[in-house]
Amino acid sequence: MSRIITAPHIGIEKLSAISLEELSCGLPDRYALPPDGHPVEPHLERLYPTAQSKRSLWDFASPGYTFHGLHRAQDYRRELDTLQSLLTTSQSSELQAAAALLKCQQDDDRLLQIILNLLHKV
């Protein structure tokens, strides 16, 4: 018979979702997976201590704020609707063109959803 052996040094003995406050704790304090929709942050400073320039570019490319809520379809659609309403109320021609492009994209998305629903029924 084979046995499953846990490895406490990599933290797989307690796999459970945790809150954002618990994410600030160090690895010895917690052995859990982040909540659904949140990425597992890489430890670049520890893994690649010599790549200073790449690390500074990575810090510039990944801002401190995140949009985890946009992974959910309803939140994404709501944010797109508010963005479109802001763009259509502006007086700038560039923003009006962006609103028209966003409207075309939303129409295409709705058409693809209709086609997908029809394919499921067939």
From Swiss-Prot:
Induction: Temperature seems to play the major role in regulation of transcription of the lcrE-containing operon of pYV, whereas Ca(2+) concentration has only a moderate effect at 37 degrees Celsius, and no effect at room temperature. Signal peptide: none annotated. GO terms for cellular component: extracellular region. Interacts with YscY. It comes from the Bacteria. It is found in: Secreted. This is Yop proteins translocation protein X. Its main location: secreted. The region between residues 50 and 110, which contains the predicted coiled coil domain, is essential for interaction with YscY. The gene is yscX. InterPro entries: T3SS_YscX (IPR012672). NCBIfam families: type_III_YscX (TIGR02502). Keywords: Coiled coil, Plasmid, Secreted. The keyword Secreted applies. It comes from Yersinia enterocolitica.
